[in-house]
Every structure is written in C-alpha cells, then in structure tokens.
C-alpha cells in the first residue's frame, strides 16, 4: 500500500510468549519462526516464510511506498502452489478459491481490498523447487512481467502458452488463475489482462545454473526485485553487479539488511521487544 493503514499497526504490549521462538508475527498471525529466519544466514536457501514476511513488510510499512509510483500488492508464495498447477481440469473452481485464500493471507485481514481495485500492480511470488521468481500483473498498464534472476536460457520458468491448461508453462498457468479471479470479482481490467502478453525482464545481473549452488541466493534476488520493480515506469535497477564475486557480497549484505528490516518493522508485534533487547547487547 502507498499510504499508512492504521489497521496494520500493532501494539508491542500484545507480544506473547512465542518470542524468542518466533521473531516475526503480525497482528493477523503471519509469523516467522526463529529457525526459519536463520535461513537468512550466508550460504542458506531462504525459507518461504521469510519471503512471505518480506511481502507483509512491503505491504504494511509505508516507508516502502514509492511516491508517484503504482500501488503494489505482494502475495505470499503460497498463493499459487503445485497442485493448482498440475490440476488438469477444475470444474469446481478450486484453483481460484485457493488463490483467493492466498490473497486473504497476503492482505492480512483487509478483506475489503479483495476486489484488487485499490492496486495498480499485483506481485505473485513463485517457488518451484528452490527457485524463486515473480509473475507481476500490472493492472494499470495492462501488461504482465516475468522477473527471474535466472536468464531465459537457464530458467525453468518458460514462456509457453497453449490452449490446454496442463500444457502451458507455469507463468501462463498463473495468468489463467489470476484472470479467472479478476472475472470472479468483476474487475474492470479482466478482459484486458486476459489479452495481455507476458514479458520477461532482461536483467544484466542475471545468474546461470552453471554456478555452484545456483539457487542459494534465489530468495534474496526475489526480495530485492519485489522491493524495486515498478514495471516500465522507470528503469529497473537493483544495484546488483554483473560480476559474480561482487554480486555475492551484495547478496550477503542484503541478507543482513532484510533480517533487520523484518524484525524491526512496525508490522512486527515483537519489533519493540527486539529493539529493547538490542540496547543491552
């Protein structure tokens, strides 16, 4: 959201006995256990719950709104899961119902926003194996973007459409689910988004599968892309070097930064508790 929403403010006095076993929890129960947050340590694959916590921070902390830029919604990575992609037929609308549940989790109780009319862009975080990438729906510009740290030759996130759902590549399956949801809520951009194409972002800092442990930094790239990407409204520059060693140093720095941002965010009910304890370290 681009404006401060009082519904996401938390009372530090409400902190419960889950701390320090839980390091992040918002007022609607989205949480990150300490053991999961440790996946931000150097050399570890980032846990899905950590990427989800970052989505909640971006959604709820007004300091991450960009003046003059689109209103963005960041979905938890469980908004689209494996069974939704492998289900050949869906006569009962199970895929759309599951996606709606993911939106409810992402909106942290703000169900009045489920029609998505308050947003210009919707970010769907995908996790396939250990590979994170983003499928971004730009409702304002009526287009879609695939943002993936792996280059098009090394990525499993292919762009292949087909009349048969099961033959589509994952980004096009996500598009089908999203468009069906727009139709369900009578969104005015449903028809335009159905006709839109998916554009793969060309990233100078992209990585390849040829490097050792190609997915270790995948979550970090996704979190940085979530933070910085606003479509074609401005040049997409994340500050990443094109050189592997320098890029690794930058990812290590971002691991520390994101750990601090998540724990000290105003949407974290334990934020003030953590600040007080840090004063005595």
Show the residue positions of the predicted features.
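Enzymes acting in ubiquitin/UBL processing and closely related pathways
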Residues: 1-281
């Amino acid at each position: 959201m681009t404006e401060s929403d009082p519904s996401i403010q938390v009372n530090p006095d409400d902190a419960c006995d889950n701390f320090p076993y839980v390091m992040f929890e918002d007022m609607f129960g989205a949480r990150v256990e300490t053991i999961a947050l440790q996946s931000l340590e150097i050399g570890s694959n980032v846990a899905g719950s950590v990427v989800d916590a970052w989505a909640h921070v971006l959604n709820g902390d007004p300091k991450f709104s960009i003046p003059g830029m689109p209103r963005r919604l960041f979905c938890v990575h469980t908004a689209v899961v494996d069974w939704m992609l492998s289900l050949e037929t869906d006569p009962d609308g199970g895929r759309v119902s599951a996606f709606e549940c993911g939106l409810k989790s992402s909106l942290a109780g703000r169900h009045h926003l489920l029609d998505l009319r308050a947003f210009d862009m919707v970010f769907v975080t995908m996790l396939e194996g250990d590979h994170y990438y983003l499928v971004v729906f730009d409702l304002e510009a009526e287009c879609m973007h695939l943002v993936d740290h792996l280059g098009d030759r090394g990525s499993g996130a292919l762009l292949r459409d087909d009349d048969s759902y099961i033959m589509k590549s994952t980004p096009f399956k996500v598009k089908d689910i999203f468009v069906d949801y727009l139709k369900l809520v009578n969104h005015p951009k449903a028809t335009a988004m159905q006709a839109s194409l998916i554009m793969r972002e060309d990233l100078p800092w992209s990585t390849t599968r040829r490097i050792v442990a190609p997915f270790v930094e995948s979550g970090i790239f996704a979190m940085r892309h979530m933070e910085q990407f606003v479509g074609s409204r401005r040049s997409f520059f994340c500050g990443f070097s094109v050189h592997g060693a320098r890029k690794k140093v930058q990812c290590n720095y971002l691991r520390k930064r994101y750990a601090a941002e998540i724990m000290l965010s105003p949407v974290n009910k334990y934020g003030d508790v953590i600040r007080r304890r840090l004063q005595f370290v």
